[in-house]
């Protein structure tokens, strides 16, 4: 067990809450003490949902542990059914209630409720939130759609002549990063291709919609962390293939279109939608100083991290210097992607390890979660959020998808703008000492005579006795600066005047200038970097 102030994922019952809240007429009864009743805060404050999540808690207290907590759970189930009248019910235990082993599934079955009851066995001390969401969605699909599954070996019936191909969108949940906007974007894209979206699940789906998932021709998996397990079950029992391409970025969206056209049985030369993304042209037309070769560190859930690395390198010209995820279930995929970019994958759920890696790599842009936003702010590095977990500002009122062609536009804006936002500050810093633009200068329209120039402070008279002391100090400094021949120089120290000169270099190339100068000094065995060293390095690498 680890004490921390931040976690990338909650316990698995939080994932179950995300699925239950996304569904329309399903209720979740959670065996939990008072301290675990925080779902209202997650969904109403952070996601700003206009309704409370469909979760009922038993809220047992310490004094109840000496009595019959199982009876408390049965009472809570009965009351939840009578009050909310759901068409299906999920039952499970929180991480704390799991310790008392009351078996919520067996207790709910004993009530013989007239609706399907889905028992959730979520090992809170071995698994986490995304796994809990995936397992919950899988169990819901298996319980509700299972009775309609054909007998094993039954061939899938052909689509009726003239009927439009149809599919399901699987994976979006409550509290997901831009899930609602992604659903709207991909639904519109599929409709323009002539493909009907039959059901979106779990977001906005009813129990009856889940039961009829097998009627679609194929499934589109938007978020493998949540939907891949359920999609695999539907493929085995209903013969429904599912997509493997995640449509994040222009190239991936085009590959996604080719894949769905093949699954839908439509010709490969079907015209693409008219509203293509502007980001490819923007990426080519924007000053290459802002984009080409920018060092970027990426961390998030596996789906968004892998997609972000691909977009960063193939569509924006960035250089990936770090790639990682907190999703241990998809660690192999992230490691394979990291090998492609020549970096070592960072698989961890400890934000301190992530912060140490960012500080070590000195990237020029960080793409990550809410925590990476805080890390980048502390380290003074531009940042954009690409993945859950996120805070309230990443549930915007505007339309802001991550997927599809419009999602590519959003990615370009949100990734490139942080790199450009510091230009004004840099210009102010450059001209702060100028006679015309210093802080004490009058407004330009008032004329230079409006404010008298500040009086210069008188220089202290140097006494003759100080001269030898100054000379001795300079000699000692020179002796310290000159290293012994046997001591190799690893990292040279920056002289104050050289550090000041370095700050005059525009921030978007300052990091490269620093690295080149330190490399130049190390190759020549210089212990101290002076202004002359800085300009010698510039001339050397300029050639």
Curated annotation (Swiss-Prot):
GO terms for molecular function: 4 iron, 4 sulfur cluster binding; ATP binding; metal ion binding; oxidoreductase activity, acting on iron-sulfur proteins as donors; oxidoreductase activity, acting on the CH-CH group of donors, iron-sulfur protein as acceptor. Binds 1 [4Fe-4S] cluster per heterodimer. The cluster is bound at the heterodimer interface by residues from both subunits. Pathway: Porphyrin-containing compound metabolism; bacteriochlorophyll biosynthesis (light-independent). Its cofactor is [4Fe-4S] cluster. The active site is at 287 (proton donor). It comes from the Bacteria. Keywords: 4Fe-4S, ATP-binding, Bacteriochlorophyll biosynthesis, Chlorophyll biosynthesis, Iron, Iron-sulfur, Metal-binding, Nucleotide-binding, Oxidoreductase, Photosynthesis. The keyword ATP-binding applies. Its EC number is 1.3.7.7. It catalyses: chlorophyllide a + oxidized 2[4Fe-4S]-[ferredoxin] + 2 ADP + 2 phosphate = protochlorophyllide a + reduced 2[4Fe-4S]-[ferredoxin] + 2 ATP + 2 H2O. Substrate binds at residues 422-423. Pfam families: Oxidored_nitro, PCP_red. GO terms for biological process: light-independent bacteriochlorophyll biosynthetic process; photosynthesis, dark reaction. It is an enzyme of class 1 (oxidoreductase). Gene3D superfamilies: 1.20.89.20, Nitrogenase molybdenum iron protein domain, Proto-chlorophyllide reductase 57 kD subunit B. The keyword Cytoplasm does not apply. [4Fe-4S] cluster binds at residue 36. Belongs to the ChlB/BchB/BchZ family. Protochlorophyllide reductase is composed of three subunits; BchL, BchN and BchB. Forms a heterotetramer of two BchB and two BchN subunits. Component of the dark-operative protochlorophyllide reductase (DPOR) that uses Mg-ATP and reduced ferredoxin to reduce ring D of protochlorophyllide (Pchlide) to form chlorophyllide a (Chlide). This reaction is light-independent. The NB-protein (BchN-BchB) is the catalytic component of the complex. This is Light-independent protochlorophyllide reductase subunit B. It comes from Rubrivivax gelatinosus (strain NBRC 100245 / IL144).
């Amino acid at each position: 067990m680890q004490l921390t102030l931040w976690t990338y994922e909650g316990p698995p019952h939080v994932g179950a809450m995300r699925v239950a809240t996304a569904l329309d007429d399903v209720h979740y009864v959670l065996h939990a003490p008072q301290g675990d009743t925080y779902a209202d805060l997650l969904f109403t404050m952070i996601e700003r949902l206009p309704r409370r999540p469909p979760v009922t808690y038993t809220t047992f207290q310490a004094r109840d542990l000496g009595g019959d907590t199982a009876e408390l759970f049965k009472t809570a189930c009965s009351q939840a059914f009578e009050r909310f009248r759901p068409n299906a019910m999920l039952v499970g235990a929180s991480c704390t209630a799991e310790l008392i082993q009351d078996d919520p599934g067996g207790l709910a079955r004993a009530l013989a409720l007239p609706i399907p009851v889905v028992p959730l066995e979520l090992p809170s001390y071995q698994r986490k939130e995304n796994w809990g969401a995936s397992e919950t969605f899988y169990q819901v699909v298996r319980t509700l759609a299972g009775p309609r599954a054909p007998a094993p070996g039954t061939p899938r019936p052909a689509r009726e002549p003239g009927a439009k191909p149809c599919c399901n969108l699987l994976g979006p949940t409550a509290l997901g990063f831009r899930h609602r906007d992604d659903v709207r974007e991909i639904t519109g894209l599929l409709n323009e291709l002539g493909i009907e979206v039959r059901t979106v699940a779990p977001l906005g789906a009813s129990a009856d919609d889940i039961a009829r998932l097998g009627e679609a021709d194929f499934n589109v998996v938007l978020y493998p962390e949540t939907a891949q397990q359920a999609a695999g079950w539907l493929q085995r029992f209903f013969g429904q293939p599912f997509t493997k391409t995640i449509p994040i970025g222009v190239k991936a969206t085009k590959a996604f279109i080719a894949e769905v056209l093949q699954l839908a049985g439509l010709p490969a030369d079907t015209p693409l939608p008219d509203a293509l993304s502007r980001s490819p042209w923007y990426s080519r037309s924007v000053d290459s100083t802002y984009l080409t070769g920018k060092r970027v560190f990426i961390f998030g859930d596996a789906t968004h991290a892998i997609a972000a690395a691909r977009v960063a390198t193939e569509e924006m010209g960035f250089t990936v210097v770090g790639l990682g995820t907190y999703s241990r279930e998809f660690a192999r995929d992230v490691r394979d992607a990291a090998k492609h970019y020549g970096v070592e994958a960072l698989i961890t759920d400890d934000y301190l390890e992530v912060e140490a890696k960012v500080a070590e790599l000195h990237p020029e842009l960080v793409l990550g979660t809410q925590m990476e936003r805080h890390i980048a702010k502390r380290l003074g590095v531009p940042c954009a959020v690409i993945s859950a977990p996120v805070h309230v500002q990443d549930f915007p009122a505007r339309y802001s998808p991550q997927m599809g062609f419009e999602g590519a536009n959003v990615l370009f804006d949100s990734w490139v703008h942080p790199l450009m936002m510091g230009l004004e500050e840099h210009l102010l810093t450059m001209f702060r000492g100028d006679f015309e633009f210093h802080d004490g200068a009058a407004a330009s329209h008032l004329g230079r005579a409006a404010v008298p120039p500040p009086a210069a402070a008188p220089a202290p008279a140097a006494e003759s006795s100080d001269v030898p002391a100054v000379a001795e100090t300079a000699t000692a400094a020179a002796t310290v600066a000159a290293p012994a021949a046997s001591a190799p120089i690893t990292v040279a120290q920056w002289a104050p005047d050289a550090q000041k000169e370095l700050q005059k270099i525009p921030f978007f190339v300052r990091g490269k200038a620093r690295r080149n100068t330190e490399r130049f000094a190390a190759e020549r065995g210089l212990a101290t970097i002076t202004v002359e060293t800085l300009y010698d390095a510039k001339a050397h690498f300029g050639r």
